[in-house]
Amino acid sequence: MGSDDLSTGDKIQKGFQINYMILRDADTGKVIWQENKDFSAPDLEHEARVPVKILDMRAVSREINFSTIEAMENFRLDQKVLFKGRIMEEWFFEMGFVGANTTNTWQSTIEAAPESQMMPAKVLNGNVTIQTSFYDNETLITKSVVRLYYI
């Protein structure tokens, strides 16, 4: 199978990788979690161990550093937070055009749910997954699942 036989999504996926992710307190800029791992691999469930204090923050700034071989016209992601498989929250982020053969850093701010909707860490621990679908326009590039553990 030559490269001409690959779908657009498959071509982008082959040359796409996450280099690292950083979560910061959006108010102070202080790093609360960092992982130098490619969370974009679709065939396994990833794990992240994040400090429990993240649940008390008003907002979190997420920084994703990624590399791509293929250009993307409208890079975006859909992110679902699931508790025991049921959707609790869903967010949509759009970055836009990404050039070929580039490494990019994308920062987004995620605001916490109202305190009345928050559950304790001991209930959430190991029961929350974040499902992130990466797209170029409507073409799915990859889908990542990360299970959260609070430490």
Curated annotation (Swiss-Prot):
This is Probable cGMP 3',5'-cyclic phosphodiesterase subunit delta. Keywords: cGMP, Cytoplasm, Nucleus. Belongs to the PDE6D/unc-119 family. GO terms for biological process: sensory perception of light stimulus. One of its GO terms (cellular component) is cytoplasm. It holds the Pfam family GMP_PDE_delta. Interacts with Pde6. InterPro entries: Ig_E-set (IPR014756), PDED_dom (IPR008015), PDED_dom_sf (IPR037036), Rhodop-sen_GMP-Pdiesterase_dsu (IPR017287). It is found in: Nucleus; Cytoplasm. Its main location: nucleus.
